[in-house]
From Swiss-Prot:
Family designation: Belongs to the TIM16/PAM16 family.
Function: Essential component of the PAM complex, a complex required for the translocation of transit peptide-containing proteins from the inner membrane into the mitochondrial matrix in an ATP-dependent manner. In the complex, it is required to regulate activity of mtHSP70 (SSC1) via its interaction with PAM18/TIM14. May act by positioning PAM18/TIM14 in juxtaposition to mtHSP70 at the translocon to maximize ATPase stimulation.
Alphabetical list of PANTHER family matching this protein: MITOCHONDRIA ASSOCIATED GRANULOCYTE MACROPHAGE CSF SIGNALING MOLECULE, MITOCHONDRIAL IMPORT INNER MEMBRANE TRANSLOCASE SUBUNIT TIM16
Known partners and oligomeric status: Heterodimer with PAM18. Component of the PAM complex, at least composed of mtHsp70, MGE1, TIM44, PAM16, PAM17 and PAM18.
GO function terms (MF aspect): protein domain specific binding
The protein's name in its UniProt record: Mitochondrial import inner membrane translocase subunit TIM16
Presence of keyword Protein transport: yes
Keyword field: Membrane, Mitochondrion, Mitochondrion inner membrane, Protein transport, Translocation, Transport
Annotated organism of origin: Candida albicans (strain SC5314 / ATCC MYA-2876)
Gene: PAM16
Cellular component terms (Gene Ontology): PAM complex, Tim23 associated import motor; TIM23 mitochondrial import inner membrane translocase complex
GO process terms (BP): protein import into mitochondrial matrix
């Protein structure tokens, strides 16, 4: 009787684990395919940060997002947070990565706009 119960528990656990594994694999494959469809993957490696966070760091609104504004805010915040002013390298790196992320986003948006313009001609 105990053997039958133990075997039943093992088979039930294995089937639950198998279903969870296949569902996780399906979700990962779907996310991978969506990421490869053109939009750059979320910037999460090598210091990259999400666009929304980068805009908060540089205190920018979506409506005022331009390369000039990004560089202006970057210069100001980078200099204010310099080690010579008694501030931290950590804050400077956050400001730098925010600027880098927004520059990449602006390049991507410009590329999309150019492709749409070329497609409509």
């Amino acid at each position: 009787m105990a053997h039958r119960l133990l075997v039943n528990v093992i088979f039930t656990g294995a089937s639950v684990f198998g279903r969870a594994f296949t569902e996780a694999y399906r979700q990962a494959a779907k996310a991978s395919a969506a990421g490869a469809a053109g939009r750059p993957a979320k910037a999460s490696s090598a210091g990259g940060i999400p666009v929304e966070e980068a805009m908060k760091i540089l205190d920018l609104e979506k409506s005022e997002l331009s390369l000039d504004k990004v560089e202006e805010k970057y210069e100001y915040l980078f200099n204010v947070n310099s080690k010579e002013q008694g501030n931290s390298f950590y804050l400077q790196s956050k400001v730098y990565y925010a600027m880098d992320t927004l520059k990449k986003e602006l390049e991507y948006l410009e590329k999309l706009q150019n492709e749409k313009g070329a497609a409509s001609n």
